[in-house]
Amino acid sequence: MMVKLGNVKLVTDILDQNGQQYSVYSDVTGEPTDKMVDAGLQIYKNEECDFLIGIGGGSPIDTMKAVAVVAAGDGSIDDYMGKRIRVRTPRMVAIPTTSGTGSEATQFTIITNTEKDIKMLLAGSGVMPDLAIDDPTFTMTAPKSVTAATGLDALCHASEAYTSRKRQLLTDEFALSAIKKIFEYLPICYNEPSNVKAVSYTHLTLPTKL
């Protein structure tokens, strides 16, 4: 989808202009799986890459983070399930095109084990991207269904932060601010996807609530 919409080309054009070599892996569809991670890792190793850029929703970014973990260590992604990832992973840049998952700003990634049909959680500082580029204009090309679903996802995250047992006065301020902005601007984003103000407020509430 990111290739079709031209979003990947926006990134590769910049790499070309700066003389950077790269390879593109664009076969992440739906929820990220161990097989997608293996395929991405194979390209990473074969092309002798040394950094990663993930662009898209939560699935491509989660896949990038998992590839980075295995690239920095040995074995397969299954070996890291439930473990704290503190190893120094390759540099990662996350460019989210949806507003709800928060994958670009968290120390977690979830990958499906296709053989056991379970979701594997990886967590730790090694899973955190080095840079997140939150450009609201990327969300303008998303289908309405994605805008609604990811917006509600962001609302759930903010509500969870506000009701958490570990909540603090500062996190309450962030969470309430995010909830108010989502209720105000998400309907506008849904009906007017090119409304820059509404899209910006909705997209940028994600870092605020975190």
What are these regions (language model features)?
Residues 40, 63-68, 158-159, 179-185:
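Buried hydrophobic packing segments
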Residues 60-73, 105:
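Short Gly/Thr/Asp-enriched flexible loops that form oxyanion-binding sites at enzyme active sites
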Residues 72-170:
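A glycine/threonine-rich phosphate-anchoring loop and its flanking beta-alpha core
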Residues 167-179:
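An accessory alpha-helical subdomain
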